[in-house]
Amino acid sequence: MHQLTLAEIARGLADKSFSSEELTGALLARIKQLDPQINSFISITDDLALAQARAADARRAAGETGVLLGAPIAHKDLFCTNGVRTSCGSKMLDNFKAPYDATVVAKLAEAGMVTLGKTNMDEFAMGSANESSHYGAVKNPWNLEHVPGGSSGGSAAAVAARLLPATTGTDTGGSIRQPAALTNLTGLKPTYGRVSRWGMIAYASSLDQGGPLARTAEDCALLLQGMAGFDAKDSTSIEEPVPDYSASLNASLQGLRIGLPKEYFGAGLDPRIADLVQASVKELEKLGAVVKEISLPNMQHAIPAYYVIAPAEASSNLSRFDGVRFGYRCEEPKDLTDLYKRSRGEGFGVEVQRRIMVGTYALSAGYYDAYYVKAQQIRRLIKNDFMAAFNDVDLILGPTTPNPAWKLGAKSSDPVAAYLEDVYTITANLAGLPGLSMPAGFVDGLPVGVQLLAPYFQEGRLLNVAHRYQQVTDWHTRAPNGF
C-alpha cells in the first residue's frame, strides 16, 4: 500500500479495496520501521491517526464520498495541531502543545484526512538543508549521506521514502520547491494569500506560504483543493474563488507560451542540470508549448534583498519567544534581562540567532534606509520584471536548484554557500507568485527538479503543465533503493 499515490488511495478507499484504518496501521508500522534511517518525523501521532481513520471509515460507511476522506497526511511541524507538540524544529518550542489547529490542519481534518504525525524541519524554517533542526538532521532517502533540502526536508524525505503519499510544507524562499527537487517530488508553493497562514508559526510573514508535497501533480491538485481558500482569521488571505484544480489537469498545452530567463543559465548552474532542463523543454514542445528566451534583469539582486527582508521579519516575529509566556525558559534567571538573554540564547540554535541578528541590524535606526528600504525597492523591481515577462509568456521555466543535493555538513561552515542554493526559488516569494517544482531526471543518482512559475492564482496552469509532463515521462515514478 505504501507505493500508492494519493489519487490511487482515494480510488482504493472509494471502491473499498482497503479501509482507512488498515491503510493507517500499515503506514504507521512502515514509519516506525524505516524512519530511524532518515529522521523525517519529529512526532508520530498513532492514537490520533487511528481514531481519525476509524472516524473516516464511519463517515464513508454513512455515505460520505469526499476524495480526501480517510487518506493519510503529515504536517510540517510549524502548523499548530491541537494537543500535539508543535516544535518548529526548535528547543525553544520543544514543550509547546498548540491549543488549536492551524486553518490548513483544520481544513484537511474536516475533509477527513488522517494525521500520521509532524515532520522534521530546519529550526523555525530557516535553512536549505534540514540540518538546523533541534531534533537532528534529516537524511535524503536517495543517498543517506546527502541533505534532502530545506526547510521542509522532513516532509519531502518522508514522501520520497514512501512512508506516506503526501505532506504539507511551507515555502518562504523555496522551502517546498527546493526539497521537492532534491528528493524527486512534485512541490507547489501557491500564490501568497491563497492558503491561510493562521496557525502557521511565522518566519517571514510577507513571504511564508503553505503548500503540498507529493509524488505527482495530480496529488498536489487534490491536496491544494483541500488547503486553499479565504480565511477571515488571516489578514493576508485573499478572497479569490478556488477553481477545481483536478478538472484542468488534462488541458491541452497547444500554443502555451513558456519563457526561459537567460539569467537562469549563467555561471553557478551545474551544466548537467542545464541539460536536463533543456530535455524537459523539448518534452513540453512536443506537447505543443512554444518556448522563447526572456529576461529577468533584476534577478541578480534577489538573494541580497531576500536576506535582508526575511531576517528583518524574523527578528520581529521571533521576539515573542522570550521565556515569559510559552516555550523554553532558562533555569533560575537573576532578573528579567537575564531571563530574556539566556532563554533566547539557550533556546535558539546558531542559524536562527544569526538571522535574528542580521534582521535586527537591518531594522536599526542607522541602517533601516540603507538596507531594509533598499531591499523592499529591489523587491518591487523583481515583481515588475515578472509582470513584464508575463505580458509575453504564460509560464516561466528553469532549474529549481543550481546543484543536486550536497553532502551533509558540506555547507554548514559557509552559510552564504547554502543561501546561494535558493537563487532560483526566492524570486517567486519576493513577488508572491505561485511556483512548482517537478522531477526532471538525475545527476550522479541524485534527483533534479525543474521549476515552473505562473502569474497570480494560476496554480491550475502549473499543475496542468506538470501533469501533462508526467504523463510522458517517468522520473516521478522512480523510488530510492531500500525504500
Swiss-Prot record:
Q: Please provide the Gene Ontology terms (biological process) for this protein.
A: translation
Name the InterPro entries for this protein: Amidase, Amidase_CS, Amidase_dom, AS_sf, GatA
**Coiled-coil residue spans:** none
Q: Which UniProt keywords apply?
A: ATP-binding, Ligase, Nucleotide-binding, Protein biosynthesis
Keyword ATP-binding appears in the UniProt entry:
yes
Q: Name one Pfam family in it.
A: Amidase
Q: Which residues form the active site?
A: 76, 151, 175
The terms under GO molecular function for this entry are: ATP binding; glutaminyl-tRNA synthase (glutamine-hydrolyzing) activity
Its Enzyme Commission number(s) read 6.3.5.7
Give the transmembrane ranges.
none
Per the record, the domain of life is: Bacteria
Q: Does the keyword Nucleotide-binding apply?
A: yes
**Which GO cellular component does the record give, naming just one?**
glutamyl-tRNA(Gln) amidotransferase complex
- The reaction(s) this protein catalyses: L-glutamyl-tRNA(Gln) + L-glutamine + ATP + H2O = L-glutaminyl-tRNA(Gln) + L-glutamate + ADP + phosphate + H(+)
What is the role of the protein in this entry? Allows the formation of correctly charged Gln-tRNA(Gln) through the transamidation of misacylated Glu-tRNA(Gln) in organisms which lack glutaminyl-tRNA synthetase. The reaction takes place in the presence of glutamine and ATP through an activated gamma-phospho-Glu-tRNA(Gln).
Q: Which family does it belong to?
A: Belongs to the amidase family. GatA subfamily.
Assembly and binders: Heterotrimer of A, B and C subunits.
Name of the featured protein: Glutamyl-tRNA(Gln) amidotransferase subunit A
Which species is listed as the source?
Pseudomonas putida (strain ATCC 700007 / DSM 6899 / JCM 31910 / BCRC 17059 / LMG 24140 / F1)
